[in-house]
Amino acid sequence: MKLSRRSFMKANAVAAAAAAAGLSVPGVARAVVGQQEAIKWDKAPCRFCGTGCGVLVGTQQGRVVACQGDPDAPVNRGLNCIKGYFLPKIMYGKDRLTQPLLRMKNGKYDKEGEFTPITWDQAFDVMEDKFKTALKEKGPESIGMFGSGQWTIWEGYAASKLFKAGFRSNNIDPNARHCMASAVVGFMRTFGMDEPMGCYDDIEQADAFVLWGSNMAEMHPILWSRITNRRLSNQNVTVAVLSTYQHRSFELADNGIIFTPQSDLVILNYIANYIIQNNAINQDFFSKHVNLRKGATDIGYGLRPTHPLEKAAKNPGSDASEPMSFEDYKAFVAEYTLEKTAEMTGVPKDQLEQLAQLYADPNKKVISYWTMGFNQHTRGVWANNLVYNLHLLTGKISQPGCGPFSLTGQPSACGTAREVGTFAHRLPADMVVTNEKHRDICEKKWNIPSGTIPAKIGLHAVAQDRALKDGKLNVYWTMCTNNMQAGPNINEERMPGWRDPRNFIIVSDPYPTVSALAADLILPTAMWVEKEGAYGNAERRTQFWRQQVQAPGEAKSDLWQLVQFSRRFKTEEVWPEELLAKKPELRGKTLYDVLYATPEVSKFPVSELAEDQLNDESRELGFYLQKGLFEEYAWFGRGHGHDLAPFDDYHKARGLRWPVVNGKETQWRYSEGNDPYVKAGEGYKFYGKPDGKAVIFALPFEPAAEAPDEEYDLWLSTGRVLEHWHTGSMTRRVPELHRAFPEAVLFIHPLDAKARDLRRGDKVKVVSRRGEVISIVETRGRNRPPQGLVYMPFFDAAQLVNKLTLDATDPLSKETDFKKCAVKLEKV
């Protein structure tokens, strides 16, 4: 066959990526070269992180056989990371689930039984019985769902409707609680609206990049490649990287800073002090667009109320704040001197000053990037607020090339978990369940009785674990997440509840994960391009894809599972009589009729799909389900600064960044000339706040929930590696990625290893107050912790590092701190 220059370049890109990771050229590259004419290509966003790279998916004979970077995608411009090039192989692991599995003994369900294949009708029969029994005996608070930032937009929306409107339970929360909740609360406190004001286009215009607790080189490698290009092509560009240990992003750093865990709060306040002391405040911006408030302190650690740390806290969980003057704020940050900061953080003074100068220099455009180092933090909301302070003091915000930017880790943590409102306290478009007006808006749009949606906030992720253990949450459905491996404190707070005979656990997943194997019922799930989908990435870019192949066996999408299960419930079985009396026409209808087969959702015919276009759910139901759900959902944000484009526009584009007004996307929010919601002459308007002003918060340093002592003498930090994504349930089934990083290791400083008579390659027992795991000593490699700290990734199901972690959370966001707990080591 003829091989075009473009095909040759694509194949070489794959080969180069494989070579960079020390791998042989995969079949993906060979497919591009050898079968170009036989492969059908279509676009999709990548299945992995929140960057939102565009890929071209190659299908042949009903299978995904190839994948390449989409040269027309503005995010990645044709480049993929090593995981992206192996996307086809995540779908075809040898142990892919193809039929429902129920624990059974002697032909019926048994908590201690063996997993046995059953039909979907049988699976729904058991689920129906468990849900109806719990609802009848204990009410809506006895059921719950744990969802995902990997749900498609309409899957998250359908789940939220089913639980909040159908079952009248706000006990639905996404795994984004573990990664982005602190960012959400930080945005809401400072700006009154969620999500970043900038976009990836800032990279090519910035003068300085500051990474706070973010290893972009491995976790957001495509964005890092753009930063690297910017840094290496302009000698005046500066990169600063802050972390508790050295990692691959330090290789590009002009100023690489290692600080004592938790002391990032000190550094942030020091920089604010430096800006004020050096008269570097942008007075015009500051005087017009900023308010000052002092936040409540000593707010606890989100542990059980009986925990000594919670009992000792003066203001546990308090989000309170009060106005303060500039002079009071100036005096507050003045305590964070250079000398004090250097002492508390362990960072040399010259490095601190260099960092502060970047923010203070009025001629430098600065972008602050952060991910889990800030968010998975018992003061994660504060850390978010404090970095916003720096940009608000200097006016370096909402303009090309400068601004604070919270990066996301999952493909639709923004588009689904946050924007749709699948958190236990949220509704679509930044609305919340505690606000009567917001509930009323949803109830009217959904045509359900007033008072249907509960006003009480539901159980967040960690609270769900505790309620399961305590026997208060009895039916629990998890989708598109592996929380038994990814969540904190497995031994004490999660496993007991999952295996409690009072509780029934359902896991929907493509593979037999740690979570699935701990459940009672496993539902086989369609993944990625086996369904039509939509994700929203970190820069507010919403991206669609078509179903391109069918799922194996009886595997069904999460959307299908939710919608079909809703047929099992009539309104009389889930709503009290006083609600039905308000809308008697809904009596006798199923939740499917009320929530999904409504005139609003079902008005788009299947004929809108091309004749040969796959869409299993819509063709089965007889209407274009995804379009109906999306257009209903999009209504909530239009006209309110969350405007999404019409459904069909997304299938034509490589994503659009909201707000999309009059067909035009928005790159920079809150600034005149960029944001359609900011009028001429306003300059800047932070319209999430009633007065249009953002808030600078005065917030102090407070210590971690658990720190090393004489017995448990090391800090433990957990995280990811380039080759694997989250718990590895997809990437470890790709042979090439598995070979590249086959098992987790314990990264440790050579002197700490030597002091414990440990050598590289030794087996070592890592012990905390909550559990222990066996790992392998690594004194070299990509991650280089300082003395006193060890680092361990969580992708390895054979080394469940979250047996060790503490379920301490930020009291405001309820997000777990996976970066700081105390451990000791024992040689095996």
Curated annotation (Swiss-Prot):
Predicted to be exported by the Tat system. The position of the signal peptide cleavage has not been experimentally proven. Keywords: 4Fe-4S, Electron transport, Iron, Iron-sulfur, Metal-binding, Molybdenum, Nitrate assimilation, Oxidoreductase, Periplasm, Signal, Transport. SMART domains: Molybdop_Fe4S4. The keyword tRNA processing does not apply. Mo-bis(molybdopterin guanine dinucleotide) binds at residues 83, 150, 175, 179, 212-219, 243-247, 262-264, 372, 376, 482, 508-509, 531, 558, 718-727, 802, 819. [4Fe-4S] cluster binds at C46, C49, C53, C81. Substrate binds at F794. It catalyses: 2 Fe(II)-[cytochrome] + nitrate + 2 H(+) = 2 Fe(III)-[cytochrome] + nitrite + H2O. Its cofactor is [4Fe-4S] cluster; Mo-bis(molybdopterin guanine dinucleotide). The keyword Signal applies. Its EC number is 1.9.6.1. Gene3D superfamilies: 2.40.40.20, 3.30.200.210, 3.40.50.740, Dimethylsulfoxide Reductase, domain 2. GO terms for cellular component: membrane; nitrate reductase complex; periplasmic space. Residues 1-31 form the signal peptide. Component of the periplasmic nitrate reductase NapAB complex composed of NapA and NapB. This is Periplasmic nitrate reductase. The gene is napA.
